[in-house]
Amino acid sequence: MEPVATRKYEQRLRAETADETRRRVLAAVHDHLTEDPTQQLSLDKVARNAGVARSTIYGSFGSKAGLLDAFAEDLWARSGLAALTEAVAHSDVREHVRGGIVAATRMFAAEQDVYRALFSMAKLDPGSVGAAVDRMQRDRRGGMAHLAQRLADADLLRDGISVEEAAHILWILTSFESFDTLATDRGLAPDEIAALLNRTVEWALYNTSAVEPQS
């Protein structure tokens, strides 16, 4: 094999090996969060379960916080971020609301135990898990403010509801905690939860002309 071809092959092999190692580490984090949701994330346990050295985790992710950031991004992608992104890009703000709630509900349902563990562990380990959750919440906070403003611009908010108040209400209704309570304590299926949350948005925020009759 020619030297240049050999180098390219070796580079590709190293990249594939690094990617496989990264996948094993992220899978080990997933297992840790589902098996020990009340315990702080242990890099020693993650490394052991992934079959790598602790130093490999630092080499791949930089830090514990970097590992959790990467895990959160992977979690969003695997549980349905693309569908959520598509839903909130709709030109009709009411479809933005409906589709966004359906997509977010399905995301939470796809990995309910992991999302619950992340939000719980953020309070136990704010320096690492907390950073990943804070970023998730910061993105959602901006999304709710944008959505509330879109509703106001479309003259859909009922009298007496400010943009800020609408954002607060949307924040509550689209939270994981609201989904988890309805799924776990009330036993509702994901599509039932999405339908109920969408009706609640209409009842709480929309003026009479904006509410579409139920079929």
Q: Across the structure, where does each feature detected by a protein language model lie?
A:
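Short, basic, alpha-helical segments at the C-terminal edge of helix-turn-helix-like DNA-binding modules
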Residues: 43-45, 72-80
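Amphipathic alpha-helical packing segments from all-alpha helical-bundle domains
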Residues: 106-119, 128-154, 164-168, 195, ...
